[in-house]
C-alpha cells in the first residue's frame, strides 16, 4: 500500500491520493452501469446509446456520458456509430455470468450502505458501528426487513461472489485432503464446502446455516451432485452443530462478530469436536500482520458495518485460548486471507 521510493516522493504521494479519489468515482460508475442492467443489455453485442436509453428509460445525453465513463474505466468499449460493447470487466457485471461480481459492485455503493461509510469519523469517535449510527439498528436487522429486500439480495450475492473469488486461494493453500468429514458452519448455500468435497472425493460434509439459505443450499448442492454427500442442518449455530467431524470450518464468520459472541461460538464448537486428537478447527479469515496489506484496508468494512474486525495473531491467540483452542499453524491464502489451523487444548 506504500509507493516505491522515488526522487520525488511528494509527487508520488500526490499521484496516489489523486488516484484514490478517481477510484471512488469509478466505483459509482460501475454501480450505475450495473443498476441500469447495461451489461445484460449488451450481452449479445454492441448497441447504440439511443437504443440503450430507450431500454433503460434514461436521458440519452446523460447516459452517453455514463457509458463513456464506463469505457474510460475499461468496463465497456466505445465502438463506431455512437455504440458501446462489453469489455471483460463489464462482462463480470452481467446478472447471469457464472462468476459475476455484480452483487459486490452494487451492495457497497447502495445509498443506504454508502451513507454508513460517511459516518466513519463518528464511528471512530463513539465506538459504535457506523451502519448502526446511521440506521439505528445493526446491519443484519436492517437487511431482514421486507422493504430492504433488494439490498439484502445484493448482499447475499456479494457474499457468494466473495466466496467464488477467494475459493482457489483457500483450496490451494492448505491440505484439506487430511480430513474425511467437514462441518462448514455459516457456509451459506454450500459453495465452499462443494469446492472442498470436489477436491477431496472421499470426504463428506455437514452444512450449517440459518433458515434464510435453506432453499438455495438444497438447490445448489443438488446442482453439484452432492446431495448424498452433504447433510444440511438449518437453525441456530449453537443448537445444530454436528459431532463426529474431523474438520470444523468457519469461513469469514468471526470477522463479523465481537469477541464475546465469537468466544461463545468457539466454545460450542470445542464441545462438538470432542477429544479426537486429529480433529481441527479451520478458521478462514484475515490475520493482520501475517497476511497482505489489503486485509488492513478491508477491515474498514468490519468497522463500518458490523461489530467484528480483522484480528492480529495476538488477538487470535487470546480469543482461541479463551475457548479451549491453540493455533497449530497459519497458512496464508493470497493477499488477504489465511487458514488458521487450530486444535483443542488438553483438559
Swiss-Prot record:
GO MF: O-methyltransferase activity; protein dimerization activity
UniProt-listed GO biological process terms: antibiotic biosynthetic process; methylation
pH dependence of activity: Optimum pH is 8.8.
Binding site for S-adenosyl-L-methionine: 209, 235-237
Pfam families: Dimerisation, Methyltransf_2
Assembly description: Homodimer.
Function, in words: Catalyzes the S-adenosyl methionine-dependent conversion of 8-amino-8-demethyl-D-riboflavin (AF) into 8-methylamino-8-demethyl-D-riboflavin (MAF) and roseoflavin (RoF), the last two steps in the biosynthesis of the antibiotic roseoflavin.
Protein's name in the database: 8-amino-8-demethylriboflavin N,N-dimethyltransferase
Organism: Streptomyces davaonensis (strain DSM 101723 / JCM 4913 / KCC S-0913 / 768)
Lineage per the UniProt record: Bacteria, Bacillati, Actinomycetota, Actinomycetes, Kitasatosporales
Amino acid at each position: 500500500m506504500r509507493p516505491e521510493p522515488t526522487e520525488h516522493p511528494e509527487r508520488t504521494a500526490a499521484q496516489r491520493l489523486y488516484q484514490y479519489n478517481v477510484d471512488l468515482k469509478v466505483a459509482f460508475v460501475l454501480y450505475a452501469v450495473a443498476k441500469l442492467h447495461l451489461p445484460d443489455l449488451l450481452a449479445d453485442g454492441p448497441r447504440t446509446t439511443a437504443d440503450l436509453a430507450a431500454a433503460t428509460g434514461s436521458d440519452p445525453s446523460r447516459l452517453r456520458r455514463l457509458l463513456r465513463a464506463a469505457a474510460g474505466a475499461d468496463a465497456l468499449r466505445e465502438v463506431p456509430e455512437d455504440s458501446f460493447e462489453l469489455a471483460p470487466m463489464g462482462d463480470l457485471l452481467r446478472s447471469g455470468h457464472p462468476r459475476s461480481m455484480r452483487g459486490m459492485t452494487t451492495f457497497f455503493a447502495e445509498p443506504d450502505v454508502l451513507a454508513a461509510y460517511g459516518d466513519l469519523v463518528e464511528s471512530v469517535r463513539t465506538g459504535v458501528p457506523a451502519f448502526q449510527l446511521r440506521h439505528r439498528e445493526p446491519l443484519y436487522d436492517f437487511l431482514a426487513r421486507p422493504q430492504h429486500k433488494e439490498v439484502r439480495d445484493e448482499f447475499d450475492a456479494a457474499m457468494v461472489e466473495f466466496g467464488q473469488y477467494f475459493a482457489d486461494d483457500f483450496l490451494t493453500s492448505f491440505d484439506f485432503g487430511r480430513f474425511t468429514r467437514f462441518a462448514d458452519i455459516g457456509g451459506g448455500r454450500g459453495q465452499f464446502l462443494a469446492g472442498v468435497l470436489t477436491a477431496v472425493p472421499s470426504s463428506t460434509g455437514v452444512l450449517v446455516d440459518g433458515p434464510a439459505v435453506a432453499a438455495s443450499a438444497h438447490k445448489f448442492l443438488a446442482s453439484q451432485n452432492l446431495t448424498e454427500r452433504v447433510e444440511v442442518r438449518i437453525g441456530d449455530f449453537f443448537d445444530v452443530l454436528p459431532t463426529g467431524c474431523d474438520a470444523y470450518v468457519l469461513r469469514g464468520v468471526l470477522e463479523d462478530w465481537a469477541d464475546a459472541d465469537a468466544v461463545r461460538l468457539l466454545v460450542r464448537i470445542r464441545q462438538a469436536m470432542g477429544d479426537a486428537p486429529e480433529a481441527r478447527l479451520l478458521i478462514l479469515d484475515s490475520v493482520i500482520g501475517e497476511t497482505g496489506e489489503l486485509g488492513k484496508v478491508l477491515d474498514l468494512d468490519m468497522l463500518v458495518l458490523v461489530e467484528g474486525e480483522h484480528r492480529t495473531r495476538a488477538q487470535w491467540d487470546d480469543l482461541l485460548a479463551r475457548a479451549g483452542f491453540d493455533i497449530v499453524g497459519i497458512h496464508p491464502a493470497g493477499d488477504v486471507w489465511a487458514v488458521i489451523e487450530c486444535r483443542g487444548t488438553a483438559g
